[in-house]
Amino acid sequence: MRYADIQVETERLRLRPFEMGDAEDWFKIMSSPEVTRYWSHLPWQSLQEAQEDIIQDITHMERKEYLRLAVIDKATNALMGMCVFFNHYPNSRRGEIGYCLDTAYQGRGIMKEAMVAFITYLQTHLSVRRLEADIHPDNKASATLLMKLGFEQEGYLKQRWIVGDEISDSIIFGLLLPSKVE
């Protein structure tokens, strides 16, 4: 299956590839200092960054280099965030996940719902047996989400990221599948 054709649905959400029409909403999300506080880049400064990101995304997805899906509210069709699967090693059946959510939607269980569906998709359609996540040590909400999904803390890497003027560490979480994710 082409990554561009993937659709994953839950009761409240639709996960689908990004489209150029998402650029303004994607910029709004990724220009937020709150959303990007623990991200691997500074907040975006222009709509062009969102447009270029979506174009790059389409190219990478066509090559199956990673899988990034927009998280859409089925009731309003609003872009709420995204889930991504990257650094995929098919022979080892493992890869990394990431996610972000607009602050307007945080604290409602939305990302947990999205990630359960996303991880189930990865396990079912890509035969993934191991997932990893790399988070900032201060990102307590993300650590809580990962633990609710069954991930375990596996390591701590010092001075892993430089974003702007800040050098930060990383906590590494891992999940062995076929554990059922709920």
Question: Residues of each region from the PLM?
Answer:
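A generic secondary-structure signal
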Residues: 56-60, 121
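Short loop/turn motifs at secondary-structure junctions and domain boundaries
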Residues: 59-64, 151
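Conserved GNAT-fold acetyl-CoA-binding loop/helix
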Residues: 34-56, 67
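A short hydrophobic/aromatic micro-motif that marks alpha-helical segments and, especially, helix-coil
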Residues: 46-48, 61, 180
